[in-house]
């Protein structure tokens, strides 16, 4: 029996490796379309012999795109970047690249197309990342009206760039940044429990709704099969919303490191982002600061994980398992930190 073929663009990345495992378990032949097939060769062990097929393709090259989707029943586009560098910019990747994939899928009579976007995608956003994600969605629908759009919040999992980054930061500094909080403490006079309370964090700053990478992968597989998914947009978030302060407190508690949480103004972050973005693979960019200015949570009334039959996994159930490597060990544990 010939197995159905699912082409996954960007399948060697963080979400991709989890999606490939889910698709293989679901019985599909997975064609991993990446610029360098060697980057995806390690994923072949996730399936039977011949089930996982690394494939050379570039979303900017129509010839390789056509070959990558030829004979495929479904296509998933995971390709995205967090920062720009030279020709690798948001417009080329998130907008034109997405349009190219959709055009190739339509020309090949592919049955299903799933595009991974992001919560906050909006052409009126102050962040180019969000603007180009929204433009990419529009381009996808123009070429492939029955596409399914998946918008995840911050994705967490063993290889994530969010929690791992801040946990690593906590190993080297006594101060942890929180975003979107009042820079000047709020004085609250004559409250129920004191004459004067000093509020350093306000409402806790920017809000996030982290979603587990395995849940995202399961949702994509479900979207490829669900009869009512074509033409729909889903926003994926975990079961809880956390403020910037909540996240830093949870993270430092998990790794057993007490740290001072300091509100950092966006203007200060923007200066550093502007400076750091001038080097390859920057830790922070100006555009990322603009993204932090907006809450990253599921919109009211949006279709969610539940609509795809996936139960959201709490961050507290997963984070300790892979952040434990950031805990104090040896001489660190014996000293006061």
Task: List the predicted regions and their residue ranges.
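Conserved glycine-rich Rossmann-like NAD(P)H-binding loop of the short-chain dehydrogenase/reductase
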Residues: 28-38
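NAD(P)H-binding glycine-rich loop region in Rossmannoid oxidoreductase-like domains
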Residues: 37-107, 119-123, 224
């Amino acid at each position: 029996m010939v197995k159905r073929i699912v082409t996954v663009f960007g399948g060697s990345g963080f979400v991709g490796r989890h999606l490939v495992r889910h698709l293989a378990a679901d019985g599909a032949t997975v064609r991993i379309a990446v610029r360098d097939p060697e980057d995806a060769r390690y994923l072949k062990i996730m399936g039977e012999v011949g089930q996982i097929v690394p494939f050379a393709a570039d979303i900017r090259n129509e010839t390789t795109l056509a070959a990558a989707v030829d004979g495929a029943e479904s296509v998933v586009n995971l390709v995205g970047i967090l920062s720009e560098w030279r020709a690798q910019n948001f417009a080329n990747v998130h907008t034109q690249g997405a349009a190219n994939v959709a055009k190739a899928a339509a020309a090949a009579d592919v049955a299903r197309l799933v595009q991974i976007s992001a919560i906050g995608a909006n052409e009126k956003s102050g962040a180019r990342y969000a603007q180009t994600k929204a433009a990419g969605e529009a381009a996808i629908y123009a070429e492939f009206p029955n596409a399914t759009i998946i918008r995840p919040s911050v994705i967490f999992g063993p290889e994530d760039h969010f929690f791992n980054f801040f946990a690593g930061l906590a190993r080297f500094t006594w101060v942890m940044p929180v975003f979107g909080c009042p820079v000047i403490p709020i004085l609250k006079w004559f409250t129920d429990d004191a004459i004067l309370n000093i509020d350093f964090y306000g409402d806790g700053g920017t809000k996030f709704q982290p979603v587990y990478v395995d849940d995202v992968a399961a949702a994509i597989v479900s979207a490829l099969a669900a009869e009512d998914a074509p033409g729909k947009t889903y926003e994926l978030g975990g079961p809880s919303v956390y403020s910037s302060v909540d996240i830093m407190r949870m993270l430092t508690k998990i790794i057993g490191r007490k740290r001072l949480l300091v509100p950092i103004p966006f203007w200060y972050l923007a200066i550093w982002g502007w400076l750091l973005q001038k080097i390859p693979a920057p830790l922070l960019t100006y555009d990322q600061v603009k993204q932090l200015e907006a809450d990253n949570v599921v919109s009211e009334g949006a279709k969610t994980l539940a609509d795809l039959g996936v139960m959201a996994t709490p961050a507290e159930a997963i984070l300790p398992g892979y952040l434990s490597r950031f805990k104090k060990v040896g001489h660190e544990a014996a000293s006061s930190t």
